[in-house]
Amino acid sequence: MNQKIRIKLKSYDHNLVDKSSERIVRAVKATGAVVSGPIPLPTEKEIFTVLRSPHVNKKSRDQYQLCTYKRLVDIYSTSSKTVDALMKLELPSGVDVEIKV
C-alpha cells in the first residue's frame, strides 16, 4: 500500500490518551509498519467563570477549566495487516479518534 495514515486522538483525560496511543503504536509495530509518535499536541484549555451567588456579590466568582489533551500518530509503509490490526483495536469510550489516509 505504501501510504501514510495519520491518527489524531483527543480526550479530557490525559491518561486515556497516552494509553490509547501506546496501544496503537504496539499494534502497528507488530505488523511491521513504521510509526512516528505519539507526538503530544498543545493542550486546549477552556476557562469558564461563574458567579457563586445567583443574586448578589459580583466579586465572588468560581473558575472552572476544561482541558483537551491531544496526541498525533503517523504510520508509514502500511500493509493490509496494519489496517486489520487498527480495525480490531478497541479503545476506551472517552477517546475521540480521527483517522486520515
Curated annotation (Swiss-Prot):
Q: Could you tell me which Gene3D superfamilies the record lists for this protein?
A: Ribosomal protein S10 domain (3.30.70.600)
What biological process terms from GO does the record include?
A: translation
Give the source's domain of life in one word: Bacteria
Q: Please name the InterPro entries in this protein's record.
A: Ribosomal_uS10, Ribosomal_uS10_CS, Ribosomal_uS10_dom, Ribosomal_uS10_dom_sf
Q: Which Pfam families match?
A: Ribosomal_S10
GO CC entries: ribonucleoprotein complex; ribosome
Any one Gene Ontology molecular-function term assigned to this protein's record? structural constituent of ribosome
Q: Which keywords accompany this UniProt record?
A: Ribonucleoprotein, Ribosomal protein
Q: Give the family this protein belongs to, as stated in its UniProt record.
A: Belongs to the universal ribosomal protein uS10 family.
Say what the protein does. Involved in the binding of tRNA to the ribosomes.
Instruction: Report quaternary structure and partners.
Output: Part of the 30S ribosomal subunit.
Please report the name of this protein according to its UniProt entry. Answer: Small ribosomal subunit protein uS10
What organism is recorded for this protein? Cytophaga hutchinsonii (strain ATCC 33406 / DSM 1761 / CIP 103989 / NBRC 15051 / NCIMB 9469 / D465)
Source taxonomy: Bacteria, Pseudomonadati, Bacteroidota, Cytophagia, Cytophagales
